[in-house]
């Protein structure tokens, strides 16, 4: 990718986030009580748009990353599951879970009050794919064109955590995002 001034680089980082949030606000405006179905519409819309941006970036940014073998992917999934359990246990032991218990209850109510297949589709597939495309597929890769691995990863993690809204989700997103970006 050719040299770009700092202002252009920042715009290239900000506009995918703005699009992501605008889609969320538009869907919320159209379906204020839409629950997980509205969330599914939002995430699928994000996957399509972020997929287009990712595809365009793939043509411009030469990615030097290693290919992930099936064995490594399975190991990473197992480590991710263990990390989820570990983070939950850590939050329980330290009392962090009670910091914003009302927020946690509201999130749980919104996520787990619909049909199981819809929960799996939204929470287990659509949301992670949309977030991975945006935060690691677009933002992290764009930052890697002008920053080293460490600062790029840290910046992407901080943005990923901040977008999750409340302290508990931000901490959780930061810790698990660090596993994914590693």
Predicted regions and their residues:
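N-terminal membrane topogenic signal
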Residues: 1-17
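Alpha-helical transmembrane segments in multi-pass membrane proteins
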Residues: 12-57
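Hydrophobic faces of alpha-helical transmembrane segments in multi-pass integral membrane proteins
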Residues: 15, 19, 23, 41, ...
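Structural signal for membrane-spanning alpha-helices in multi-pass inner-membrane proteins
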Residues: 24-28, 50-57, 88, 123, ...
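Transmembrane helix-loop junctions in multipass membrane proteins, especially transporters and channels
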Residues: 28, 32-33, 55-62, 92-100, ...
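Membrane-interface starts of transmembrane alpha-helices
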Residues: 30-45, 114-119, 148-156
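Juxtamembrane helix-loop-helix connectors linking adjacent transmembrane helices
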Residues: 62-130, 145
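Transmembrane helix-loop-helix hairpins at the membrane interface
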Residues: 116-182
């Amino acid at each position: 990718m050719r040299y770009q001034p700092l202002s252009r680089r920042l715009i290239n980082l900000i506009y995918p986030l703005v699009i992501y949030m605008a889609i969320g606000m538009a869907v919320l405006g159209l379906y204020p009580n839409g629950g997980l179905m509205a969330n599914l519409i939002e995430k699928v819309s994000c996957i399509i748009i972020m997929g287009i941006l990712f595809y365009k970036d793939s043509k411009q940014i030469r990615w030097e990353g290693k290919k992930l073998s099936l064995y490594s992917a399975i190991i990473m999934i197992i480590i991710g599951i263990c990390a989820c359990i570990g983070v939950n246990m850590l939050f329980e032991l330290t009392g962090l879970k009670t910091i914003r218990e009302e927020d946690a209850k509201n999130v749980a109510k919104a996520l787990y009050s619909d049909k199981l297949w819809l929960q799996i589709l939204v929470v287990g597939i659509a949301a992670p794919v949309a977030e991975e495309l945006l935060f690691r597929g677009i933002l992290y890769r764009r930052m890697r064109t002008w920053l080293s691995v460490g600062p790029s990863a840290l910046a992407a993690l901080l943005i990923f955590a901040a977008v999750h809204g409340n302290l508990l989700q931000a901490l959780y997103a930061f810790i698990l995002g660090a596993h994914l970006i590693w």
